[in-house]
């Protein structure tokens, strides 16, 4: 099972239908990847994601989505090992996904598809990053984007 919390930071909350769409996207991706755990999705404005992108990635501009995986130790952090028998006592906190709502609107218009489709795409994209997928090479990109499309097609968010 996947536990999802949706937060709004410095923006008006999105409606309940869109929140349910995000949960459906994450549940479908978790099922495809056979993973359980907890995810927090925070919806923000361009100023906030710009700040986070600058502070954590050293990129001084807004972006569409950021992912902060909790299962990967950060620079200078110790890796924590838990006995397999005890692991079930702790929640599997997968991480945080931060999405710029204004960027999602802008990109939906640029790509000629719905805001819902773009928001779903960014949600699944961020989730796959939490699981370690990347798109730094053509092979990685092909793998990641094919998984994204599979999830989006499954829930009816086609182009």
From Swiss-Prot:
Q: Quote the Pfam families the UniProt record gives.
A: YbeY
Q: Which SUPFAM superfamilies match?
A: Metalloproteases ('zincins'), catalytic domain
Q: Entry's InterPro entries?
A: MetalPrtase_cat_dom_sf_prd, YbeY, YbeY_CS
Which processes are annotated in GO (biological process)?
A: rRNA processing
Q: Which PROSITE patterns match?
A: UPF0054 (PS01306)
Query: According to its UniProt record, where is this protein located?
Result: Cytoplasm
Note accompanying the cofactor annotation: Binds 1 zinc ion.
Q: Which UniProt keywords apply?
A: Cytoplasm, Endonuclease, Hydrolase, Metal-binding, Nuclease, Ribosome biogenesis, rRNA processing, Zinc
Could you tell me the superkingdom of the organism this chain comes from?
Answer: Bacteria
The GO cellular component terms are: cytoplasm
Could you tell me the EC number(s) of this protein? 3.1.-.-
User: Which EC class is the enzyme in?
Assistant: hydrolase
Which residue spans traverse the membrane? none
Cofactor(s) needed by this chain = Zn(2+)
Q: Where is the signal peptide?
A: none
**GO terms assigned for molecular function:** metalloendopeptidase activity; RNA endonuclease activity; zinc ion binding
Residue positions annotated to bind Zn(2+) are: 125, 129, 135
* UniProt function note: Single strand-specific metallo-endoribonuclease involved in late-stage 70S ribosome quality control and in maturation of the 3' terminus of the 16S rRNA.
The family annotation for this protein states:
Belongs to the endoribonuclease YbeY family.
Name under which the protein is recorded: Endoribonuclease YbeY
């Amino acid at each position: 099972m996947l536990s999802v919390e949706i937060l709004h930071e410095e923006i008006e909350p999105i409606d309940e239908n869109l929140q349910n769409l995000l949960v459906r996207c994450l549940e479908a991706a978790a099922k495809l990847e056979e993973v359980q755990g907890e995810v927090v999705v925070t919806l923000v404005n361009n100023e906030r994601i710009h700040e986070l992108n600058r502070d954590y990635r050293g990129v001084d501009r807004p972006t569409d989505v950021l992912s902060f995986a909790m299962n990967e130790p950060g620079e200078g952090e110790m890796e924590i090992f838990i006995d397999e028998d005890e692991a079930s006592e702790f929640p599997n906190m997968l991480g945080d996904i931060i999405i710029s709502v204004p960027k999602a609107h802008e990109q939906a218009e640029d790509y000629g598809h719905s805001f819902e489709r773009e928001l779903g795409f960014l949600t699944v994209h961020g989730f796959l990053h939490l699981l370690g997928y990347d798109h730094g090479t053509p092979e990685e990109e092909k793998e990641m984007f094919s998984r994204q499309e599979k999830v989006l097609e499954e829930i009816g968010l086609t182009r």
